[in-house]
Amino acid sequence: MKSELTVPLIQLAPWRVPADCELPEALRPWLLEADSMTRRLRHHNRHFSVQLLGNRSVTLCADEQQLVAAEQPMGLCREVILHGDRGPAVLGWTLFAEAALQESGLRELGEQPLGERIFGDEPARRDHLQLACFEIASNPWCPAATVWGRRSRLFLGQWPLLVHELFLPSLSCNKELE
């Protein structure tokens, strides 16, 4: 599915469980965060915003289709950039089955953070945390770089969502990571 994103990426290695990865020490707390990434970014930044890059239909890979419980290989993708004090910090995209759009309120999200909806009042369910490195091409939000990312399955009510978060170079400049 990643070839359909706004920001060109090449995944350098398959998704792996955290125990099988040598993580950069500065990114470890971000990659392994169990709570909301929105909440973490807000905690470490005075300024936080979500830039919606788009919502579109995409072809899901077999493992993506299974993780989001899609009956068809077509799914939906919501792509965003999360901004902090130093600019674009996280490229995020969420995959979900088309049925989830109608029933979960995802259609009305706009630039509201998904994390606020998922981690709202009730404890969120997360599983299938996996990590990988990506080569990201130069784009309007960051220079070309090798970046770490994670994906995990979160649930919005009964609906499984496959949430991807890539940590952009400007995040490593944050003093909280040192």
Swiss-Prot record:
Keywords per UniProt: Cytoplasm, Lyase, Pyruvate, Ubiquinone biosynthesis
UniProt GO BP: pyruvate biosynthetic process; ubiquinone biosynthetic process
GO annotations of cellular component type: cytosol
EC number: 4.1.3.40
Chief subcellular location: cytoplasm
Subcellular location: Cytoplasm
Xref: InterPro entries: Chorismate--pyruvate_lyase, Chorismate_lyase_/UTRA_dom_sf
Binding-site positions, substrate: M37, R78, L114, E165
HAMAP family per the UniProt record, alphabetical: UbiC
Name of this chain's protein: Probable chorismate pyruvate-lyase
Organism for this UniProt entry: Aeromonas salmonicida (strain A449)
Organism placement in taxonomy: Bacteria, Pseudomonadati, Pseudomonadota, Gammaproteobacteria, Aeromonadales
